[in-house]
Structure formats: C-alpha cells, structure tokens
C-alpha cells in the first residue's frame, strides 16, 4: 500500500466549517478509501451524541503505517490550506483515530448515516445484515473512507467511515 500526499485535493464551500477531502486518481477525484482484512470488533457498537461508532482492533502494522501516512499527508496539506485561508498562523496537529491496544491498535470508525438511516453495506455469509446486529468480539473485513475534515479547538479532526463490512 502506498499513499501520495501530493494527490490530496481539498475543496471548501464558502460558509461551511468542513473541508472536503479527495484523492486524485487519473482524471477523477475520489474519497480516500482502503480495505482492512481480518479486523476484530472488540466492543461492538458505541453510541455518542446520536452517532454510531465501531472500534476496530488491527494487529498488522502495515495498516497502521498506511493510516499514519494518510494522516501525515492530510495534516500537512490541510495545514497549508488553512494557513492560505488565514484561519491559522501556525501549523496545527491532526487528531489521530489510531491508538495502541494490548493486542495491536484500535481504529475508531464511524457508521455513516443519512436522514436517520445507516448508509453502509453489512454482509454476513453472503446476506445483508443490519449493522446494529454486530456482536462484540467478532471479526470482519472493512472498507473505510475519509470524506471531510474540520478545524476545532486548534486541531484538525476527521473520522474514518465504514463503506462496507463483511463479517467473518
């Protein structure tokens, strides 16, 4: 897995507090997206402020290094943009979504919602399943993406969102 920070594209709509994050691939720009195989779901689903999250546990350092390279590129590119826009005078740090665990690393992921409905594909044994029926301690293959970042309390924030989950 390789990531080129020079392909990060940042769009901003006047009056919004969010920066749209895209990755230039040929003639098109798409969300930064990648797959994590065989990740553990140690805690099941968490709910915070009416938002739903799943913490993944990953043992393979390759995934963490890839995420860290994305975070470093995003931090640098967005800091430059925020400086150009006059919103900051010094570089700002990106709030990572990765933290160390006993067995590897935790990655906090968000279950995307649109109009009070979950916007994610969840499959088990070839059949669609409700994301709310996920058990803690299970395993799955996740496709994650980033779509927006924002500045809050002097830090850059973002969330990995789940595009697709195939339970093992």
Task: State each model region's role.
Residues 1-113:
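OB-fold ssDNA-binding interfaces and closely related basic DNA-contact patches used
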